[in-house]
């Protein structure tokens, strides 16, 4: 069985043109319409009119300084509206924008700069030393630009790019279907990070698909047609495809984005109260922290009508807790990956608990068994996706790109799922993360969901380790809200062992101070397993 979402028409405009046209519309409706406000410093704000002008100025700086179509511009800064303005300017000048995690070490930064061949890099005061160290002996790097004041020479200030007259210079011709607009790097959970080539068409079609979906959902929860949120909180990092796309989508709608340089729980809750935030987007790690935070009772969050949780699996038990805490809020989950731009599935009001929803417009899916035959409803298999949001491929890795595709152009996701008769899809686990216990497959995510139901558990990571009698056995690393004693360990084991089949039973619990995750909240399961095994060896 193959499911198809609502059809979409192809767009023939570069994404920056689409956005610049919308900025003019926002400006005409309200010349004082604000695009961005910095959460930590509200005096640092930018209107849509100013944003449009800065994009033109920045694009002309790139052209005047000899940068060509296809050159790579790297964002290596914590979130800031200047990053978005610079990205739009670079796109208009024909450049590819890549983005690196602001928490990177110089080793990690060097890998991405060298792999992407980034010629110009945007930094802030926090990332500048790391980038400078990473760029040693990289002669192809031509310029570092800092959004912070008074950078050391030869680093130049961001203001240099925007303190110029617009001369209406000729810009390169863009082919939306084939030209790359964004080059984020995959998380590297299956090896070294790979550059993911996202085209102008990928972004434009994802915009159209998301707008249709969200408009339909707004109507379903009682909001008027074409309703525009007055404010939105933005703390998802722009180095991630989801973070960058949400910035595009929200600015397209004309919503004022309160942009966080770094995430801060109390500042988030304070701003929900201050701006009467209606819709909130979280990664699972932040959602779990919010569930366990006493600060939630300190602020009025009654304005919330919807909370979207994405970028990594969100356990059903955590979702239920969130609904108990915020009973009047619609919890929306979805499914996507960097290679799929933003999302392929999103929940609608009425979606069953535990699902990631149905296909967004323009998308098709099938689920394959191990023998290659197609699954029917409630049969478990691997999810394959086809749609206009599919990446062009991996940067300089044609063979690895081809290995992802089948003869019909569907892309394998590596995720184990099942669906019901309505196309509601349920994620079970990653293929490579399944634990084999006496030849039976155990999904870590299932065990994590049950463990999180226990009142003493704040966070958890489950993985498999070698076992002489069963092949592998599941181990849980747990962040406890209370004790780390044997009694707590036994209570957690009893909880899970009462609920699940014997072969899924946890045999060992290791208490830890934190669970390692990527910046977007994905569990670093392999890193947690390595740390566990290293600690075991050290005790021998």
From Swiss-Prot:
Listed GO biological process terms: ascaroside biosynthetic process; fatty acid biosynthetic process
UniProt GO cellular component terms: peroxisome
Tissue expression from the record: Expressed in intestine.
Catalytic reaction annotation: nonanoate + ATP + CoA = nonanoyl-CoA + AMP + diphosphate; IC-asc-C7 + ATP + CoA = IC-asc-C7-CoA + AMP + diphosphate; IC-asc-C9 + ATP + CoA = IC-asc-C9-CoA + AMP + diphosphate
Enzyme class: ligase
Main location: other
Record's subcellular location: Peroxisome
Name by which UniProt lists this protein: Acyl-CoA synthetase 7
Naturally occurring in which organism (per UniProt): Caenorhabditis elegans
Encoding gene (name): acs-7
């Amino acid at each position: 069985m193959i499911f198809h979402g609502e059809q979409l028409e192809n767009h023939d405009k570069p994404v920056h043109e689409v956005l610049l046209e919308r900025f003019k519309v926002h400006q005409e409706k309200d010349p004082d319409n604000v695009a961005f406000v910095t959460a930590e410093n509200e005096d640092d704000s930018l209107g849509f009119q100013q944003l449009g002008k800065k994009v033109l100025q920045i694009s002309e700086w790139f052209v005047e300084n000899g940068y060509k179509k296809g050159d790579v511009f790297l964002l290596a800064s914590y979130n800031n509206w200047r990053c978005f303005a610079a990205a739009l300017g670079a796109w208009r000048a024909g450049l590819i924008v890549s983005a690196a995690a602001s928490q990177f070490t110089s080793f990690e930064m060097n890998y991405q700069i060298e792999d992407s061949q980034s010629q110009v890099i945007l930094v802030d005061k926090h990332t500048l030393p790391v980038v400078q160290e990473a760029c040693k002996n990289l002669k192809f790097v031509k310029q570092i630009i800092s959004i912070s004041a008074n950078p050391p020479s030869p680093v130049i200030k961001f203001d240099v790019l925007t303190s110029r007259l617009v001369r209406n210079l000729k810009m390169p011709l863009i082919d939306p279907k084939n030209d790359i607009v964004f080059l984020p790097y995959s998380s590297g959970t299956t090896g070294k990070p790979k550059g993911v080539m996202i085209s102008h068409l990928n972004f434009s079609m994802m915009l159209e698909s998301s707008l249709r979906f969200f408009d339909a959902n707004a109507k379903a929860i009682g909001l008027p047609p074409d309703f525009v949120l007055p404010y939105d909180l933005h703390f998802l990092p722009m180095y991630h495809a989801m973070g960058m796309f949400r910035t595009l989508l929200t600015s397209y709608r004309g919503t004022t984005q309160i942009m966080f340089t770094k995430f801060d729980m109390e500042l988030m809750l304070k701003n929900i109260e201050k701006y009467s935030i209606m819709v909130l987007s979280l990664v699972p790690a932040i959602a779990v922290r919010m569930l366990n935070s006493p600060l939630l009772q300190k602020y009025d969050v009654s304005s919330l009508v919807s909370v979207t949780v994405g970028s990594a699996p969100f356990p059903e038990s955590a979702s239920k807790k969130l609904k108990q805490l915020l009973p009047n809020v619609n919890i929306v989950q979805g499914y996507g990956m960097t290679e799929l731009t933003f999302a392929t599935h999103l929940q609608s009001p009425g979606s069953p608990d535990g699902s990631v929803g149905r296909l967004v417009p323009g998308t098709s899916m099938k689920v394959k068994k191990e023998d290659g035959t197609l699954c029917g409803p409630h049969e478990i298999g691997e999810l394959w996706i086809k749609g206009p949001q599919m990446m062009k491929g991996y940067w300089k890795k044609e063979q690895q790109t081809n290995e992802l595709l089948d003869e019909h152009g569907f892309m394998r996701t590596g995720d184990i799922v099942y669906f019901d008769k309505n196309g509601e899809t349920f994620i079970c686990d990653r293929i490579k993360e399944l634990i084999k216990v006496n030849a039976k497959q155990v999904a870590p995510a299932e065990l994590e969901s049950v463990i999180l139901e226990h009142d003493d558990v704040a966070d958890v990571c489950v993985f498999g380790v070698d076992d002489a009698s069963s092949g592998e056995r599941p181990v849980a690393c747990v962040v406890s809200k209370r004790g780390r004693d044997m009694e707590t360990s036994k209570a957690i084991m009893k909880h899970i062992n009462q609920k699940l089949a014997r072969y899924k039973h946890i045999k060992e619990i290791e208490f830890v101070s934190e669970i390692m995750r990527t910046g977007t909240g994905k569990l670093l399961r392999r890193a947690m397993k390595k740390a566990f095994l290293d600690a075991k060896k050290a005790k021998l």
